[in-house]
Amino acid sequence: MEGMALYLVAALLIGFPGSSHGALYTLITPGVLRTDTEEQILVEAHGDSVPKQAVISIHDFPRRQKTLFQTRVDMNPAGGMLVTPTIKIPAKELNKESRQNQYVVVKVSGLPLELEKVVLLSYQSGFVFIQTDKGIYTPGSPVRYRVFSMDYNMHRMDKTVIVEFQTPEGVVVSSNPVNPSSVLIRPYNLPELVSFGTWKAVAKYEHSPEESYTAYFDVREYVLPSFEVRLQPSDKFLYIDGNKNFHVSITARYLYGKKVEGVAFVLFGVKIDDAKKSIPDSLTRIPIIDGDGEAILKRDTLRSRFQNLNELVGHTLYASVTVMTESGSDMVVTEQSGIHIVTSPYQIYFTKTPKYFKPGMPYELTVYVTNPDGSPAANVPVVSEAIRSEGTTLSDGTAKLILNTPLNTQSLPITVRTNHRDLPSERQATKSMTATAYQTQGGSGNYLHVAITSAEIKAGDNLPVNFNVRGNANSLNQIKYFTYLILTKGKIFKVGRQPKGEGQNLVTMNLRITPDLIPAFRFVAYYQVGNNEIVADSVWVDVKDTCMGTLVVKGASSRDNRIQKPGAAMKIKLEGDPGARVGLVAVDKAVYVLNDKYKISQAKIWDTIEKSDFGCTAGGGQNNLGVFEDAGLALTTSTNLNTKQRSVATCPQPTNRRRRSSVLLLDSKANKAAQFQDQNLRKCCEDGMHENPMGYTCEKRAKYIQEGDACKAAFLECCRYIKGIRDENQRESELFLARSDFEDELFGEDNIISRSDFPESWLWLTEDLKEPPNSQGISSKTLSFYLRDSITTWEVLAVSIAPTKGICVAEPYEITVMKDFFIDLRVPYSVVKNEQVEIRAVLYNYADEDIYVRVELLYNPAFCSASTEGQRYRVQVPVKALSSWAVPFVIVPLEQGLHDVEVKASVRGELASDGVRKKLKVVPEGERKNIVTVIELDPSVKGVDGTQEQTVIANKLDDKVPETEIETKISVLGDPVAQIIENSIDGSKLNHLIITPSGCGEQNMITMTPSVIATYYLDATGQWENLGVDRRTEAVKQIMKGYAQQMVYKKADHSYAAFPNRASSSWLTAYVVKVFAMAAKIVKDIKHEIICGGVKWLILNRQQPDGVFKENAPVIHGEMLGGTKGAEPEVSLTAFILTALLESRSVCNEHINILDSSINKAIDYLLKKYEKLQRPYTTALTAYALAAAERLNDDRVLMAASTGRDRWEEHNARTHNIEGTSYALLALLKMKKFAEAGPVVKWLIDQKYYGGTYGQTQATVMVFQALAEYEIQIPTHKDLNLDISINLPEREVPLRYSINYGNALVARTAETKLNEDFTVSASGDGKATMTILTVYNAQLREDANVCNKFHLDVSVENAQLNSKQAKGAKDTLRLKICTRYLGEVDSTMTIIDVSMLTGFLADAEDLTRLSKGVDRYISKFEIDNNMVQKGTVVIYLDKVSHSEVECLHFKIHKHFEVGFIQPGSVKVYSYYNLDEQCTKFYHPDKGTGLLNKICHGNICRCAEESCSLLNQQKKIDLQLRIQKACAPNVDYVYKTKLLQIEEKDGNDIYVMDVLEVIKGGTDRNPQAKARQYVSQRKCQEALNLKLNNDYLIWGLSSDLWPRKNDISYLITKNTWIERWPNEDECQDEEFQNLCDDFAQLSNTLTIFGCPT
């Protein structure tokens, strides 16, 4: 019998011939094949001269069930028996949903030997890029974008692209399909409620979303600057051993090219890790003259801050520079960072050097030398030691050194050092590596060295390529030619042969460099020796990055290249490739001052494209196969030379390495400190001489010192010394103030047309170059347009995509726009309603003569300003030639929203004039608060009858600022069911299961089963790469061997037994059916007759009328039965055989008519028994059989039999438990109970069971079958199909969203201004999350902040006259914060969070002194000087005393004018317990004169008039009062008495008793109790209301503020208030007429009402 088995095996394996020794057949493909892309492969027959037709076919892996592509090619001697067929793999035929790597089989037949190679697959079929019009945006603005798409041949591809916009938190807020050819791509509009930070626009192909391209842009609030500042350090590093000072040149230019006059404030510092340590003594004021200045960091200054400079090595120096214009109207802050502090100024890398060398042949060592900041270091001499070779780096930092290697060595130690003449030897940079010898095949000693020595290679060059060979003479004489492949962008671009003559050891060929080879290519060459050896080498070649085609933007004529006037007409000319599509945009260069990181460039395009190279080294390889692998190729030959299987498409990415005290006081300090020789004591002395912001005495300061008595003594001595000098200076100090202004009358300016169109980007056009090309093959097109109104330089950026020449980014074309006289109106991003602010109109005169200018601020009722409806505000100022003058205007915004600020100016005696109108954003008062509500939508759990309905209750906003909007944003996101466990069992652990079957009919199945189930599992999970894709072929061979051997034990009736003469076994026959049915899914050669014959035998011979199956001949190897051999045997056997019948159903249904009836009888039997079963194992097995037959959907009985709902256990039976639990998992998957399946999978994986053979057969089969089914079903389980309806109160039609698996992560958003209840309903399957964000402005409430565990006092006062004032500051105050912890011990790690007054910044120097020195009061501090909103200071304290009050003082400087300042706040809290906190507010008292200092002309009175004024005018008569009281919208007229004045929440509350209702209004019963009249505190003086006085008062209906059961009255500018004399005063002659008028007014309106 065994002889018969071997014969059958031999017959089945006859299709596997042995190797032919007559020729060497080779197949080479790219290491990764891309779908839907034409790819070139190579098939070669070396040593064969017989013409052949080869069949190239591509099949799916691992099952090879589909032929994805097939072609035939003729191989003949005329073509060198070499063919390069083109293949294309259609993505639609493959499973793109798989999370695993996918492979295809490339097969070559028609040769004497078939060639096969399994190759990794990629679905990325091209490149896609996004261009946004800018790199930075403000909330609410549109983001314009366009898409460029091309294939790997750089051909334009108008394939649909999905564009997603993602917030900084990664939430997808928009996802839309876009056709790159469309010129009407709708911009994405940023919402007003938007996340600040870096956003992403992500583009990916619709049918291959795993690869994407991302464009970034920032979103924040900003105002464009009027000039840019560039910093240029003298060196890119700070050499620690040097003695030179460090210089930084400062260049400041207006955006229209003129030079800035002003001042720069420069502060140097060192960044140590992530902490910035400034050098306070380096703070200097540098004049900017003619746009230039220079800052110097002296070595002594650096040493004064850091005594041991060697400790700074490895850290970086930075220079922070603030440049302010002469007029003070604009300020730009910039920083030069990343200046490395080094002992050696260079670093050496071997990033472009091959790791392998050929002994006895030249070795090209490419070294890359960088500056410490990672930039290339040019002109640096380098030298290699041992094998000496010298060179000098080029502009890209590289130098090539040729090393002549010795013959007999296997490793080559290499050390390269810089050889700079100005550096001592110990400071030269060095780098070492060891190159390894190339291993020849079989130790033959045959080598090939490909050399390309040109330094810089560009398109159009003819490149000499040298082929050097070395080996024994016999081998070399066999070489007739070299075969070479050129790869670029991951594709085989060209294949060729270079002949070699006999005796030639060096062959040179010329290679023409075409644009297709940009940005780099790989040159791979090999030759064959005999018919079994391949000798190979490769080299990576960089090509200069340029456009493959042409694109130029220029002025259409010489006139267009000149400086232009705003609004002028001009033309530009485009020159490019015929048929190219050109995208244009003009961007204000001020945008790039704020952010130029994200601008599209040709370099970025090539950087992305270069990543498509599948090669991962600089060339060469460990051996012949390594050469192909490292170049990104896959190779197989007829002699079983095979490259390793690739498992990732990309290469590992290397780290990217690119890119005022007086002089006398200072002298006194220096002299005093010099008296201490000890460095530590000198530090104590210096700290003692630093000014203490809190004003502590020297003695109190000394209490904080912990460095010992000697330090304390030095500190006290120096502290007292400097105090004496300061006191003397104080007595001599004086303060001088000066002011002048004038008025003049000039002509009107109504004819001046104001400039108002100031876009940040425009000219967003797409143009096709359809014009006939010229003699150079270039098409051109002229565009006409009108310039916008900005005085700036526009940068016109053009990006083209040509039909066959890829993407080209043109050099930007600049258009400078200016005129000799103009206004620059500097408007902040936003101002707060009712906060008085100063804006500046800067007048620029670039003429050669002085001028006099009249400036006019136009009236706008939305502001209170010096311009009124009846009289415009004008001022005349002189402006010197080639200079500027700032005219300040103070305004009070009275209404929210966007409002025009317009300024006009005309030059006296000339026609020159200008006008500017800009929008000013006015935001509401109060503190912006967010309320977030999250609702989970899960209708299957939370719904009734499948629908979840929920009412969202409106938020209670009792603290909302009146007359402000509420913004509510509703966002819905689906919750896709994620896969619980990926790669449940590691495929690499299954090697032991692929074994050779053997033995009797039972043993053969025991040993065949592991190969079947391992292959089944690895196919399902896509894990062959973990085990080795070549092992699948071996596994299939073992399966077929087991199949052939089992035929020996098949009886004529298709039943099976251990031996042919033994009675047939029901269980064994069913098991053979089950395993063969599984194997039929793996290989095609298992015949259906074999499977179905066993099924028919079971039905006809072993099934009883009631459906049960009987066993008449149990198996010999009882261990192979698994758990079925226990109790409840009939149910177990019937369920087991039923599963086998169901497995075979797809194969046998057409061949066995009674199969369905047999299955139904077994089902009926099992259904009767199911609920009564006792064993967990039998319950699980039966549940699986019934669920597989689709007759069980209820999992309650199954789960009741489990232990912990994740396993089905019986005592002391591990493998049976694994088997039974696997059946249960299969049952749950068949019932679609995916949530319940998760814990079961986790339990199975935790068992770390990798299967076996004897005694473990059923556990092995079932665990891998179950986990494979889990892997198959979970990715396709997309049980998310929700319909959501949101009924918002202001919408007639509900918002309806449909959420499924494909769009789950795209947020659906809606916004409403109402704060009302609304309903949401959800139905369907799955979950979603609805987030409701409500944003509103809350009143500042001091009493709402109850202090817990902290006492806190906050106050502000005027700074002392001798206090140092920050440069550019308009005023200086001192902030005093005193706190004490109210616990039993000191509070550790306490934080003080200070919200600054608007317009004020904290004094960093004061805070630095508090945090430095031996008498350290604070641990550290952080300043956020955000001028758009209020700045903040966060102070960290190591402790706060519980026994005494501790105070901090520091100065705050006013940098811009703000009137009616909102209160600032100070919060102290414990880091470890946030409930322990206290908040207090602070505000400068008007008595300090702060308000008066911002007055300009009569603006102060106007600012006060924004409140209601107490009407004391004598010219008011009865008729005027009646007219005003009866005006439209006047709601009420009362006579009141003022009972009480309260201060609350920053407002004044006037409590009034309504004595008489003269005209009734909204308030139904105003006399029921006293009424509250609310006024802003700023209006107190203007109103001047007195207690117990009577008043005539009326107001508008819009000024009523409904409360819970009451009404408050707002006092606004529309409120009429007059004092009503009392009865005694009415007797005086002075008040008689007034009292009569009031009485008559009351009678008229009460009796007759208002006249109609």
Swiss-Prot record:
Span list, region Factor B binding site: 743-754
Molecular function per GO? endopeptidase inhibitor activity; metal ion binding; toxin activity
Record's Gene Ontology CC terms? extracellular space
Region feature (Factor H binding site): 1197-1260
What modifications does the entry list under PTM / processing?
First processed by the removal of 4 Arg residues by furin-type protease, forming two chains, alpha and gamma/beta precursor, linked by a disulfide bond. This mature AVF is composed of three chains: alpha, gamma and beta.
Name the PANTHER family on file: COMPLEMENT C3, MACROGLOBULIN / COMPLEMENT
| Protein name (record) | A.superbus venom factor 1
Tissue expression summary: Expressed by the venom gland.
| Covalent crosslink: Isoglutamyl cysteine thioester (Cys-Gln) | C1000-Q1003
GO biological process terms held by the UniProt record: complement activation; inflammatory response
Residue ranges of the region described as C3d-like domain: 992-1270
Q: Using the UniProt record, give the first listed, main subcellular location.
A: secreted
The record places domain NTR at: 1507-1650
* Residues at which Mg(2+) binds: P519, D542, V543, D545
Q: What family classification does the UniProt entry report for this protein?
A: Belongs to the venom complement C3 homolog family.
Q: Which residues are part of the propeptide segment?
A: 657-739, 992-1270
Renumbered to this chain, the signal peptide range is 1-22
Function comment: Complement-activating protein in snake venom. It is a structural and functional analog of complement component C3b, the activated form of C3. It binds factor B (CFB), which is subsequently cleaved by factor D (CFD) to form the bimolecular complex AVF/Bb. AVF/Bb is a C3 convertase that cleaves complement component C3, but not C5 (as does CVF/Bb).
